[in-house]
A protein has these predicted regions:
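N-terminal targeting/assembly segments of extracytoplasmic apparatus and virion spike/baseplate proteins
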Residues: 1-256
Length: 256
């Protein structure tokens, strides 16, 4: 998929993206079926985070960010099996996540150890997808979906879209254009379109970056692009079982 096609798909996909977010909070009758955010409690030296979401692992990461300020990028695997998908309303499908509880010691928790424990605990649960915790060059962390169920109910390894090695000519563009170009190249090489959806548009349009590389991981190129904003931006790469598209949401951390 070329850059121009990526722009068109991005515009056409926004209504579907809005619908995706609305239906994630509804059941077939239109009543709320998931928690808006995870519930955090702390008793007897133990922190307990109770999530209830189509993507409970992401919801726990959001809770950890709220409590400790840990900024962690999150990437869905592909949810393509009936085992990993449920109907949230009469005409939409979402990942078949639900309740998930994570507990850890409240005594000066270490970010890396806690995140490792979280991912390991999640992978042992019955919720959809399997994930890996990845360290970044700047000391941060990515939680990356690496497997999902097949139609036979078996766990099957998947290639994460941002693991793809890209070759891009060095070109100075706005950061919005650069991220869109990265998404377009990932889409061209993979089986799913990757669309830049939610983002701090003003910052991405006002800042420019000269970026390219030969066989560089898409995730690294994305991280360098966002770093050129001189702000703290993290991402959520969400797979929509309905359209089979990935939606890249970028969020600005305020006050950092």
């Amino acid at each position: 998929m070329g850059w121009n096609e990526a722009i068109k798909l991005r515009s056409a996909s926004l209504p579907a993206l809005c619908l995706l977010y609305v239906t994630c909070a509804l059941d077939a009758s239109g009543a709320a079926s998931y928690a808006k955010e995870a519930v955090i409690t702390e008793t007897a030296g133990t922190v307990r985070i109770a999530a209830d979401s189509p993507r409970p692992l992401e919801q726990v990461l959001n809770a950890l960010q709220s409590k400790y300020g840990w900024i962690v990028n999150y990437e869905d695997p592909q949810y393509v099996s009936a085992v990993d998908v449920i109907k949230a309303s009469s005409d939409s499908q979402v990942p078949s996540g639900g309740s998930f509880t994570f507990e850890f010691s409240s005594a000066a928790p270490d970010e890396g150890k806690t995140l490792r424990q979280l991912v390991d605990t999640y992978n042992k649960s019955k919720n959809p997808g399997h994930f890996e915790l990845r360290h970044t060059a700047d000391g941060g962390f990515n939680v990356v979906g690496t497997a999902g169920h097949s139609d036979k109910g078996e766990i099957v390894e998947q290639q994460a879209p941002f693991d793809l090695a890209l070759t891009l000519s060095n070109k100075e563009q706005t950061i919005d254009e650069t991220v869109t170009r990265i998404c377009a190249e990932v889409s061209r090489q993979s089986r799913s379109n990757v669309v830049l959806a939610i983002s701090p548009r003003k910052i991405l349009f006002q800042n420019r970056v000269a970026l390219g590389g030969n066989k560089v991981a898409a995730r690294e190129l994305l991280s360098k692009s966002l770093g050129a904003t001189h702000g703290k931006i993290y991402w959520r790469l969400l797979f929509d079982p309905e359209s089979k598209n990935y939606y890249l949401n970028l969020h600005l951390v305020h006050g950092v």
